[in-house]
Structures are given as C-alpha cells and as structure tokens.
Amino acid sequence: MARKSLIQRERKRQKLEQKYHLIRRSSKKEISKVSSLSDKWEIHGKLQSPPRNSAPIRLHRRCFSTGRSRGNYRDFGLSGHILRERFHACLLPGATRSSW
C-alpha cells in the first residue's frame, strides 16, 4: 500500500493538470502558428508560468487497489501482483492463467 500522502499528492497534480490544461494547449498552438523566434520565446515564457505540477508528464498511473505507481496494467488499472491475485480468484472475467 502506498503512503496516503503520495496518493494525495497525485490527486493534487491531477486537479492542477485539469485546471491548466487549456492554457497549455493554447500556448502550444500559438507556438506552432508564430514564425518569428522572439515571439516564440515570449509564448514559451507564458508556457512556463503555470505550476510545475500542472504538466501532464508529472502524472503517474496508480493502482486503484493499492496506490502502487509501478508495474501497472492500463487495461485493468491494477498493479501486477494485484492483477495476478484477482486472476487466480476469478474476479476478472475473460482472463486465463498462463501455464508453461
């Protein structure tokens, strides 16, 4: 189980990302439209003005069950060991155990 502070920090980042999403997207479109280098630098300065944690690259996928940030499967939203436990308990329909 991940620490609760890490999970809360991730939720805060998600809220910030949603809040500044339109500002970032519009600034990136402006950069692609402008041809002069000085104007691009000005717009790039605007792009750096939102908080650092509002960048989408700083978000992590977390396991819904445990909050683990590593080894997640996007299709299920679970980490590897929780996914395996749920496969064995037949809680995920359509999944089969691999045997070799």
Curated annotation (Swiss-Prot):
The Gene Ontology terms for molecular function here are: rRNA binding; structural constituent of ribosome
Q: Where's it mainly located? A: plastid
Q: What does this protein do?
A: Binds 16S rRNA, required for the assembly of 30S particles.
- How is the quaternary structure described? Part of the 30S ribosomal subunit.
Cellular compartments annotated: Plastid, Chloroplast
Q: Keywords of this protein's UniProt record, alphabetized?
A: Chloroplast, Plastid, Ribonucleoprotein, Ribosomal protein, RNA-binding, rRNA-binding
Please give the coiled-coil regions recorded for this protein: none
PROSITE patterns per UniProt: RIBOSOMAL_S14 (PS00527)
Instruction: Please list the GO biological process terms of this entry.
Output: translation
Q: Name one GO cellular component term.
A: chloroplast
Q: What family, per the record?
A: Belongs to the universal ribosomal protein uS14 family.
Identify the species of origin. Drimys granadensis
Q: Which Gene3D superfamilies match?
A: 1.10.287.1480
User: Lineage, please?
Assistant: Eukaryota, Viridiplantae, Streptophyta, Embryophyta, Tracheophyta
InterPro entries attached to this UniProt entry: Ribosomal_uS14 (IPR001209), Ribosomal_uS14_bac/plastid (IPR023036), Ribosomal_uS14_CS (IPR018271)
The record's listing under Pfam families reads: Ribosomal_S14
- Designated name of the protein: Small ribosomal subunit protein uS14c
